Amino acid sequence: MNDLTILVTASGSPGTAALLRALRVNGERRVRLVGTDMAELAVGRHLCDAFHVVPPGSDPGFADALISICEREGVDVVLPQSTYDLPGLAAAQERFPCVVLVSSVDAVRRSNDKAETYALLDAIGAPGPRWHRARGRDAVAAAARELGYPGEEVTVKPLESSGSRGFRILSASADPLDQLLTNRPGVAPALRLEELVALLPETGGPELLVMELARGKERTIDGIARGGRIVLGHPKTREAMRVGLAMYFETLEDPWLMDVAQAIVRELELDHFFNIQLVGDKVIEVNPRISTVVYQDDLNLPYLGIKLALGELSEEALAAHASRIRPTRRALRYFEQVEWDV
């Protein structure tokens, strides 16, 4: 079997070390890893065979920078990790000299724009939070009150964001002093509505998504899709949050969650890796990219997804791996470090 060169973007992100290890220790072939990141201090510099600093994913020159690296490094596959990398890669994927594991421009846009995502959920009858999009202090205040504020807590976030960036809970009982004294580092404080609107212009400004606060256990469905069909995937929990990151995961067996995911994947016509996040029974986010993986010795999702994209594995052969998914599987994320001299 031929050696592979895989380029992994955002190689300073939290899941990078485990992902690179899974790609390298695949049991079949030698893999050469090329990491890219917008930051010099990315762990990919130390864990990959080659490393390049690139512009941010939102930069117009991002895709051209990656194309140049792919040509110089002889890359076979590009595996993006960051939401912000997807639009540029999707728009330019036909110009790459290799396979890029990204969905279509339309699928990426509809997934990344949370208002588009929630409109899609409403249209197909998938469970999602009640929501409004609003711009300016009066519109945001009216949207919050329509969702039950001050009697109910509501949430706000930008239309396009990644992870918990920009996410805030609006609570009439928010106590700034108590939060100052008791919140752990990295926990964003709740705001009163009047505190938020004081930050907003009367008209214009950023467009926000104002939503009901979903409550309950966090779960995701992670998998590999082709042409809007889930070929292989499974649900898992997201637990033990620290600085905005889940640190503990349990693989689940839940047909209802898989049905919800299939409806969304079909409507978006997703390809390659995807991650769909729920809080309680409400879908809150669709990520058309790889996310945290619960690895098994006999089930290497990242490597299998690459083999499917390269045509080395049929959909039927990939789907047969579903029998290996173990609901007993657990994963605990922890902090590690590397050292070097300059």
Question: Where are the model-predicted features located?
Answer:
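ATP-binding N-terminal substructure of ATP-dependent carboxylate-amine bond-forming enzymes
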Residues: 1-104
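Residues that mark the start of a beta-strand
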Residues: 3-7, 153, 209
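ATP-dependent carboxylate activation and anion-phosphoryl transfer catalytic cores
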Residues: 4, 10, 73, 241-244, ...
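Short, charged, surface-exposed secondary-structure boundary motifs
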Residues: 45, 61-65, 109-115, 164-166, ...
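Active-site nucleotide/adenylate-binding loops and adjacent lid/helix of ATP-dependent enzymes
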Residues: 110-208, 227
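Phosphate-binding site of ATP-dependent enzymes
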Residues: 181-264, 280-282
